[in-house]
Design a protein with these regions (language model features):
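Conserved structural core of kinase catalytic domains
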Residues: 1-19
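Conserved catalytic-loop aspartate of Hanks-type protein kinases
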Residues: 100
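C-terminal lobe substrate-recognition/regulatory segment of protein kinase catalytic domains
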Residues: 140-207
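Activation segment signature within eukaryotic-like protein kinase domains
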Residues: 23-24
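Catalytic-loop of the protein kinase fold
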Residues: 35-52
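Activation segment/activation loop of eukaryotic-type protein kinase catalytic domains
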Residues: 47-83
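Regulatory extensions flanking the kinase catalytic core
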Residues: 217-244
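Protein kinase subdomain VIII
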Residues: 80-93
Length: 244
């Protein structure tokens, strides 16, 4: 492999779906293999996505650093990089196979719009955990579909981070009370704007939306994602490009 996803920023407008398809496919297959062994990967991030042929019609992707895998059901609050951490891990439920699936949605979001998740735009005024969690809440949580908070038995640090993140979501800027400190949009708003401006192919947005389900009970497994209409559409778009 020649490089990593960390070193290959998306070029917006995103005119090719081939690299997106390669990353999604490699990640999902890695998650399926881990799940068959009762393991979770826990460490999907751009530097662990190995790439080759990125300038050609059929780029290849492979997931590296597989040695960090652990048994499914790890009850550890700090698993997964903060930018790509699943809601149930933030809530101290546990880290399961579907937590890996969430991390792929977050990874693709981060690749397409660097800073929409994670700590990139934090000026240091807030702890990274609080900043990352608040952005996750702004992107995906609603009044009727919130991120489940940690239980009373979770670590006090996590409980406090969750409470402070909730406050940060609606906190106004000191220099302009009409503006939020966080300018992160909701995912649907972001995706609609990206599609309307012809910045991101619909098949890529649909794939992310299919994976990024807050409730893990309703989130697809990696195996289900590989046979989904969303992945088939992404695959077909990439195949069409390679022929062209």
């Amino acid at each position: 492999m020649d490089t990593t996803l960390e070193d290959v920023p998306a070029v917006i407008p995103l005119r090719s779906t081939a690299l997106a398809k390669a990353v999604v496919e490699a990640s999902l297959h890695a998650f399926v293999a881990a799940d068959q062994e009762g393991l979770v990967y826990t460490d999907l991030k751009p530097s662990n996505v190995l790439l080759s042929g990125v300038d050609g019609p059929s780029p290849q992707a492979k997931i590296g650093d597989l040695g960090v895998m652990g048994p499914e059901g790890l009850n550890e609050s700090w698993l997964q990089p903060e930018a790509f951490r699943a809601p149930e891990v933030w809530g101290s439920v546990s880290c399961y196979h579907k937590s890996d699936v969430w991390s792929l949605a977050a990874l693709m979001l981060n690749w397409i719009d660097n800073g929409i998740v994670g700590n990139h735009d934090n000026n240091g005024s807030f702890p990274p955990m609080i900043w990352c969690l608040a952005k996750l809440m702004r992107l995906f949580a609603t009044e009727n579909n919130p991120i489940v908070p940690p239980s009373s038995t979770a670590s006090k640090d996590l409980q406090l981070s969750f409470e402070y993140a909730k406050k940060l979501v609606s906190a106004a800027r000191a220099d302009n009370p009409k503006q939020y400190i966080l300018d992160t949009p909701g995912f649907d708003e972001w995706a609609a704007a990206a599609e309307a401006a012809d910045l991101i192919p619909k098949v890529v947005l649909d794939m992310i939306r299919f994976l990024a389900i807050l409730d893990p009970a309703n989130r697809p497994t990696a195996a289900q994602a590989l046979v989904s209409n969303e992945f088939k559409a992404l695959e077909a778009a990439a195949a069409l490009e390679s022929k062209g």
